[in-house]
Amino acid sequence: MAFSVSSLMALVVISSSPVSSMSCDLPASLDLRKQETLRVLHQMETISPPSCLKHRTDFRFPQEQLDGRQFPEAQATSVLQEMLQQIVSLFHTERSSAAWNTTLLDRLLAGLHQQLEDLNTCLDEQTGEEESALGTVGPTLAVKRYFRRIRLYLTEKKYSDCAWEIVRVDIMRSFSSSANLQGRLGMKDGDLGSP
């Protein structure tokens, strides 16, 4: 009987600990969804990338600003959320629907929406959102500028198949290189200075 009471007490203590003290548990689910997103983006290839080499351009993805070492967890979440929203916005257009296989495009958008839902849940759990918003103005603005350059490029190239292919490859590269930022979501506040 004493064992049951002590077990019950342990459960009460564990279940009554504040949720806000727990880190947002996204890394495993985000990594799986990120891999699926990259797989779908790869499957969306319609033109051999080498045939579009003359159309290449540097959209200047702000890797230095997004390396993750500069941000606490809430800020990394906020910047990653902006990046996902921009990708959804880019691919959720009539012109995008005309350029891509709609089944793959729907899978891509569904996966991105799921990641956004996960990040929104995480942001809701985190404290200091006002502080994080102030700290991410520069990186968030850099992400917005990156996507603005992509949109201008597509407009200049009249949404050609090669232009979309160049954008698809660059989105894959930038999404893949955001791993450091996503890795920040798995670190506790005490780990912020860790490499």
From Swiss-Prot:
Where does it reside?
Answer: Secreted
Major localization class: secreted
Q: Where is the signal peptide?
A: 1-23
Please list the disulfide bridges.
Answer: C24-C122, C52-C162
Which sites carry carbohydrate?
A: N101
- Family in the record: Belongs to the alpha/beta interferon family.
Name of this chain's protein: Interferon omega-1
Native species of this protein? Equus caballus
